[in-house]
């Protein structure tokens, strides 16, 4: 089959449990290609040999998602979920968690070249992916979550409004993004 093409005897696909292993394999010459997040790739890889070391990272479509447990009575409230969304500074998530490799996704998740599929009236709808702490606080206030003090919101029963963010271990982009989101939520009294 395709005799004019180079003959490749074998391909090796190593598995790594974290991006540190992938980065070390890349830097030691054990990898020719990797489909993984490499922090600070310009500085640690490309700058070492700009003629031969390259990378490509989609500027859109790579999204960090929060999947909520809607069996949790607090998260089953759409206004709480919207408040959480408004409280997230996606520019900061991209800058800190994603090393500016990408851009914040559109409210539809159809960003960049995929934006051609937006319905024309979408821009007139509520943009709950916009960073808006004031709107987040309004939604939480209207949902009945009062401030216990300047740092913590409480539920009607007096218990603190808290959620756990569970994130895959070993992948610094996800971990750092979750840390940013956690810090953002503290600004609206969610711990």
Regions found by a protein language model. Give the residues of each.
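Residue-level recognition of alpha-helix initiation/capping sites
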Residues: 17, 75, 131, 175-176
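Local pocket/hinge segments that shape ligand/substrate recognition
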Residues: 5, 35-139, 143, 156-159, ...
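Flexible loop/turn segments at secondary-structure boundaries
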Residues: 19-21, 63, 172-174
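Ligand/substrate-recognition segments at binding pockets and active sites
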Residues: 10, 115, 145-191
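Short acidic, gly/pro-rich beta-turn/loop elements at beta-sheet edges
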Residues: 23, 76-78, 173-175
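Ligand-site clamp/hinge motif
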Residues: 1-44, 179-183, 191
């Amino acid at each position: 089959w395709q005799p004019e093409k180079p003959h490749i005897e074998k391909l090796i696909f190593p598995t790594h449990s974290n991006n540190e292993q992938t980065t070390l394999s890349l830097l030691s010459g054990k990898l020719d290609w990797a489909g993984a997040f490499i922090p600070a790739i310009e500085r640690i890889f490309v700058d070492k040999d700009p003629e031969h070391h390259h990378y490509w990272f989609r500027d859109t479509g790579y999204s960090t998602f929060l999947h909520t447990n809607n069996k949790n009575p607090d998260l089953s409230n759409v206004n709480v979920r919207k408040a959480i969304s408004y409280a997230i500074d996606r520019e900061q998530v991209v800058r800190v968690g994603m090393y500016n490799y990408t851009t914040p996704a559109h409210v539809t998740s159809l960003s960049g070249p995929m934006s051609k599929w937006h319905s024309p009236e979408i821009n007139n709808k509520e943009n709950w992916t916009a960073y808006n702490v004031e709107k987040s606080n309004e939604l939480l206030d209207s949902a009945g979550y009062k401030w216990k003090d300047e740092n913590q919101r409480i539920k009607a029963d007096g218990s603190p409004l808290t959620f756990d963010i569970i994130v895959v271990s070993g992948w610094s982009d996800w971990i750092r993004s979750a840390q940013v989101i956690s810090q953002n939520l503290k600004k609206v009294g969610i711990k």
